[in-house]
Amino acid sequence: MKEIEIVEVRSGAQLEQALAIRLAVFVEEQGVSRALEIDGRDGEARHLLALQDAVPVGTLRLRRVEDGRVAKIERVAVLPAARGAKVGRRLVAAALSLARAAGAEAAMLHAQTTVQEFYGRLGFVAFGPEFIEDSIPHIAMRLPLREHTGQRDGLA
């Protein structure tokens, strides 16, 4: 079995590896516009890189939204050769750990509807109507990260 390691991006070279994975998956494979994929928000995000036997095979980015209370998981991408090896699951688990450590109350993401079930198995719940982004159907999903305090905070 190939070893999978999740690391936080700490260098420009690692960020380039992450961006190359995103371009391969979203732009080349799925036909997403490059302008939408490279949206100018990478500088405000933390990035994770999945290494399979030291080779970059997956990535995601994590941004704080809603006044920092919510961690938004974005740009989850795994190269085709590494799919089915739990790379995506490991990336999301690492992102949730970072979000909890940073004090986020919830995590959210916009899932392509073809992978909604994957995120559901990780505890995310869909909310709101389905929407189209760059010709691809998406659904917003959310996962509470802290115990409910009894106050209505609109997070779940």
Question: What role is predicted for each listed range?
Answer:
Residues M1, G12-A24:
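A short, well-structured alpha-helix characteristic of acyl/acetyltransferase catalytic modules
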Residues V78, G84-S97:
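Conserved acetyl-CoA-binding loop-helix of GNAT-fold acetyltransferases
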Residues T113, I132-A156:
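C-terminal "cap" of GNAT-fold acetyltransferases
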Residues M1-G12, E147-A156:
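Conserved N-terminal entry element of GNAT/NAT acetyltransferase domains
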Residues L23-D53, R61:
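Active-site rim helix/loop that mediates acceptor-substrate recognition in acyltransferases
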Residues L49, V55-R64, V70-A77:
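Conserved beta-strand in the GNAT
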Residues G120-P129:
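Conserved acetyl-CoA-binding loop of GNAT-fold acetyltransferases
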